[in-house]
Amino acid sequence: MKNMRLTVCIGIMCGWLAAGMLHAGTRPDHVRPVEEDGSRLWLPVIRPVEGAEVEITYKGKVSPTIAIAIAELKNAWKGDPVLLEKKKTGRGDGFAITSSEHQVRILSSTETGLLYGAYSLLRMQAAGQLTVPLSVTEQPAYDLRILNHWDNPDGTVERGYAGRSLWNWEELPGTLSPRYEAYARANASVGINGTVLNNVNASPQVLTTGSLEKVKALADVFRPYGIKVYLSVNFASPIQLGKLDTADPLDKEVIGWWKQKVKEIYAMIPDFGGFLVKANSEGQPGPCDFGRTHAEGANMLADALKPYGGIVMWRAFVYSPTDSDRAKQAYLEFMPLDGQFHDNVIVQIKNGPIDFQPREPYSPLFTAMKQTSMMVEFQITQEYLGFSNHLAYLAPLWEEFFGEVRPDRLKAVA
C-alpha cells in the first residue's frame, strides 16, 4: 500500500506583527530600525551602528542559502553571537536552536533548515518569546508545503481580489522585480517550499521555450530560499504546441512529446518540482476525452517526470454541469482508481466535496482512498468569504479539517 500524502495548498496573508524588538542575552541595544513600508511583513531590517555588528559564524562553504541566513541575522538579531552548524537534528529541514552562556547555536542537517532556524529565532525575538536558555526543536510535519497561484499570462488573477499578478511576464527574464525576492523571503520565513506559478486553467503557452526561460528566471531567485517552482499544464499541449492529432496519454507520439518537453524543462531548471493538472473539469481537456482514465493520464506525465525526481499533482475537482449532484462526482470518478496511480502522483482534493464553501464536511475521498497519495487544496483567496471587502480568519476551518482527517494518515502540508 502506498503511503498517503497530504499537501495543503495555502497562501500567505500579508500583515504586520506589531512587537517590540527585545534583547536576548546581555548584548546592548546598538541598532536602529530602518524605515518600513510594510512590504517586509514581520521581518524588519535593523541597521547596526558602526562597529556593533553581531557575530554570526558558519563553519564551511557559504552557499547562497547560508549567505541569506547570515544576512538576516546580522540585519535584525540583537542577542549573543550565533553559530550556524550542519548537524543531524531529525528529518527533512528540521532544526534545533540552543543557547549557552555566550552563544546561540542553530543546527540542521540541511542549509534550508538553517535558514528556517534563523527565521524562527528572529520570530521569537520579535514576539517576545525568547527564553534563557533556548531549547527549541522543530520538525516539518509535511514534506511538501506548496502555494497554488491562479495567475494568468496577461497579469490578471482568477479569483484574485488583491491586485494584479506578482509575475510581470512581459519584463521577464531580463528584468527581475525586487518583489520576487521579497515573496521568496516571506514564504521561506514560514516554511513554504514550493510554488505553482500559474493558473490551473492553464494555457499551453506556458510550456514554450520563451515562457520556460521566464520561469527559469523566477526559479533562480527562489532557489536560495528553498523554494521549488511547479507549473500548471494543459493536457492538450501536444496538440496545440506539438501539432499532434491527439493528446491520448497512451499514444507513443504523445508520450514522446511530453518526455522531450520535460527534458527541456530540467535542462533549464534542474530542481523543477513538477506539474499541477486540472483535467476534464469545467471544460479543460483531459484523458477522458480520449477514452482514458485520470490514472492513465496522470501516470503518463509521472513517467516523464520520474527520472528527474518530479511529481504530478492531479486535481480531483471534477464535475459535469449536467449532473445535479456535484458533491458525489469526485468520489465516483476517483474512488474506483484507488491504487492505480504511480508513486510520484499525488491526487489533489479540495477540503470539501463541493467547492470551497464556508461550511461543508471534508471530502470522503480522504478517508476512502487507502492506496493513493493525496493532498488537500484549501482556498485562501476569499471567493466565498467577502472578496476584498472582508477579512476572514481561516485557521479554524483548517483546524476543523485536520480534526476530522487524522494527521497520522497524512504525509505533507503546505
Outline where the language-model segments fall.
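A generic structural signal for short coil/turn motifs at secondary-structure boundaries
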Residues: 61-64, 106, 204-207, 284-289
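Acidic, contiguous N-terminal accessory segments
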Residues: 24-104, 109-112, 131-133
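Feature activates predominantly on carbohydrate-active enzymes
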Residues: 69-72, 90-94, 99-276, 306, ...
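Bacterial N-terminal signal peptides that target proteins for export
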Residues: 1-11
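A generic structural motif
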Residues: 25, 77-89, 132-138, 277, ...
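Catalytic-core regions of glycoside hydrolase
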Residues: 243-414
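Bacterial N-terminal signal peptides
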Residues: 9-20
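Hydrophobic beta-strand segments of well-ordered beta-sheets in folded domains
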Residues: 51-57, 81, 145-147, 193-195, ...
